[in-house]
A protein has these predicted regions:
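Cyclophilin-like peptidyl-prolyl cis-trans isomerases
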Residues: 2, 15-266
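NTP-dependent nucleotidyl-transfer catalytic core
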Residues: 1-7
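Hydrophobic h-region of N-terminal signal peptides that target proteins for export
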Residues: 7-17
Length: 266
């Protein structure tokens, strides 16, 4: 099953809390005779480090914009085509039909047909993420191929709205298991850093939609009881204007005005 191997996954992987080791007591060093020192000249002193030296500059997405029209509203994300070129190009190709894929049911090669249209978010967890990209809707489907992770130290799960590839860890030959499934985070998830390829960033309004989808009624496997459908994904390039947003299904009972940032249930 294509899952997120993270602490937030209800009913699967529990959080392994790191416990600090007790401090080791050491003997007090013997007293030493103080030595006379001279104050160095100002010109010999090193430059004071900048107060911003350790501040990480945020990664800026520079690629196309993915407009994901769902049955509960529109999600808009810009892709990191420079930091995750393989994942970004893969998502673009599956979304607009320019990339071939294998039908998981018939095992036939599909050409020129968008992969994601009509699929659902098959796994949703409040405070954590929503997961989609499986035409089977079971968490077991893919596009008939896999590729390795693309991780960059400047791109972490430190903010809400990260668009990332779902995977099942390493394959039997030590290769990656990224394919078609993806997820979008509702809140920062540092426990996922380094294990999943981030290839896009969704805007603030989209995070509200993600939070609303994450709170629909769902079963014990976190699958929505009423399907939340991806109607279509548009890839906008070179200043393309987004199409008019279609009317979404009523979801006022689940609308989240301020998404929570609590840790996912264990």
């Amino acid at each position: 099953m294509m899952v997120l191997a993270a602490a937030a996954m209800a009913g699967s992987v529990s959080l392994a809390m790191a416990q600090a080791a007790p401090a080791t007591q050491t003997a007090t060093p013997p007293a030493q005779t103080p030595q006379t020192t001279t104050t160095p000249a100002t010109s010999d002193l090193p430059d004071a480090p900048s107060t911003s030296a350790n501040v990480k500059a945020p990664a800026v997405p520079t690629g196309p914009t993915a407009v994901i029209d769902t049955s509960m509203g529109r999600i808009t994300c810009q892709l990191y085509d420079k930091l995750a070129p393989i994942a970004a190009a893969n998502f673009e190709g599956l979304a607009d039909g320019s990339k071939d894929w294998i039908d998981a049911t018939t095992q036939k090669k599909i050409h020129g047909q968008p992969f994601y249209n009509g699929t659902t978010f098959h796994r949703v967890i409040p405070g954590f993420m929503i997961q989609g990209g499986d035409r089977l809707g079971t968490g077991m489907g893919d596009a008939g191929y896999y590729f390795n992770n693309e991780t960059d130290p400047s791109l972490t799960f430190d903010v809400p709205g990260r668009l990332a590839m779902a995977n099942a860890g390493l394959g039997p030959n030590g290769t990656g298991t990224n394919g078609s499934q993806f997820f979008i985070t509702e809140a920062p998830q540092p426990s996922l850093d380094g294990g999943y390829t981030i290839f896009g960033q969704c805007d603030e309004h989209s995070v509200l939609i993600v939070a609303s989808i994450a709170r629909v009624d769902r079963d014990s496997n976190d699958k929505p009881n009423t399907p939340v459908t991806i109607n279509r994904i548009y890839i906008l390039r070179n200043g393309d204007k987004p199409p008019a947003e279609p009317a979404a299904s009523p979801a006022t009972d689940h609308l989240v005005v301020h998404p929570g940032t609590t840790a996912p249930p264990q």
